[in-house]
A protein has these predicted regions:
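Conserved AMP-binding/adenylation subdomain of ANL enzymes
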Residues: 51-69, 77-117, 131
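Active-site glycine-centered loops adjacent to acidic/histidine catalytic or metal-binding residues
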Residues: 151, 176, 199, 256, ...
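Gly/Ser/Thr-rich phosphate-binding loop
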Residues: 90, 115-120, 129-193, 206
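ANL superfamily adenylate-forming
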Residues: 1-24, 131-134
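Short beta-strand->loop structural element characteristic of the AMP-binding/adenylate-forming
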Residues: 1, 41-44, 72, 94-100, ...
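Conserved ATP-binding/catalytic segment of the ANL
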Residues: 215-220, 224-283
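Conserved S/T- and glycine-rich ATP-binding loop of Class I adenylate-forming
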Residues: 27, 33-36, 70, 76, ...
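Conserved adenylate-forming
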Residues: 14-25, 30-71, 83, 93, ...
Length: 283
């Protein structure tokens, strides 16, 4: 029990001195890209972009508040895995970090811990949905409000199964990059209406698709995707040439090819340079 001893212990403590002074453009973290154009590059992510990204996530996903409980199943070495685990804590909520990926343990925790949201990559969802129907039915989560998929395209068959098992009002499919943060999101209402689509611009994000002539593409014309938002990185660590190639007057490209339909929804088509994605991690 908590009694007067706690107050006495606090009163005897000394204030912490010499705390570091953090400026908004200081580097928060340096994750590394997959290195599809050569050696992996360190991405200088400032505090400003990540904090603003957290507020954007709260607006878009609606699952971050002091009352929310998030299950972190992705590794912390993954940029999205880390930010989706930090978000609930930032807003005063709860995050339970799984020490390994075990589909049955995850669905058990979803129900037992009254989890309201979790983030995963397609490999996670494939594992969860491979469980026996009896296990899924037994552990049907009553509190779950938000599921977020990211890091690789979510196959339509898996998407339909997620909707069938967890409901038609919880799934978001998000597109983004280490350098640009979250760029677009396909909301629950559009999951079965827009096939192989990554949605519309994330809050405070502008998107344009540019053809080889340097002009904006017409609807359904494939081009290179550029994004501009408060969530961009500061550049590549000690790689000024690559930074200059990626950033152009506040617009970022990471070499993804895409198209937009007549309603402005975004579809990722290919990459300028090929890569292998395993478990949501670019190789």
């Amino acid at each position: 029990t908590i009694n007067n001893e706690l107050e006495e212990w606090i009163n005897q403590s000394k204030p912490i001195s010499n705390l570091p002074v953090i400026q908004e453009w200081d580097t928060f973290t340096i994750p590394y890209t997959s290195g599809t154009t050569g050696k992996p590059k360190g991405v200088l992510v400032p505090y400003r972009s990540r904090i603003l990204q957290l507020f954007g996530m709260a607006v878009e996903y609606g699952c971050y508040s002091p009352d929310d409980r998030f299950l972190a199943i992705a590794p912390m070495c993954h940029g999205a895995g880390m930010i989706f685990a930090l978000a609930p804590i930032f807003f005063g909520g709860y995050a339970e970090i799984m020490d390994q990926f075990d589909p049955e343990e995850i669905v058990t925790a979803l129900k037992k811990e009254h989890i309201t949201g979790f983030f995963g990559v397609p490999t996670h969802f494939h594992g969860i949905l491979s469980l026996e129907n009896a296990i899924l039915e037994k552990n049907k989560p009553a509190s779950l409000e938000t599921i977020i998929s990211n890091a690789a395209a979510l196959p339509q068959a898996i998407k339909e199964e997620i909707v069938k098992v967890f409901g038609d009002n919880v799934l978001h499919e998000t597109y983004g990059s280490t350098e640009g943060g979250i760029i677009s999101n396909l909301r629950p209402a559009d999951q079965l209406r827009k096939l192989q689509c990554v949605g519309q611009p994330f809050p405070c994000t502008y998107i344009k698709v540019i053809n080889e002539s340097g002009d904006e593409c017409n609807p359904n014309e494939v081009g290179e995707i550029f994004s501009s938002s408060p969530y961009l990185f500061n550049g590549y660590w000690k790689r000024p040439k690559e930074t200059e190639e990626a950033l152009d007057q506040g617009w970022l490209t990471v070499g993804d090819l895409a198209k937009r339909d007549d309603e402005g929804y975004l579809y990722i088509v290919d990459r300028k340079k090929d890569m292998v994605i395993s478990g949501g991690i670019n190789i």
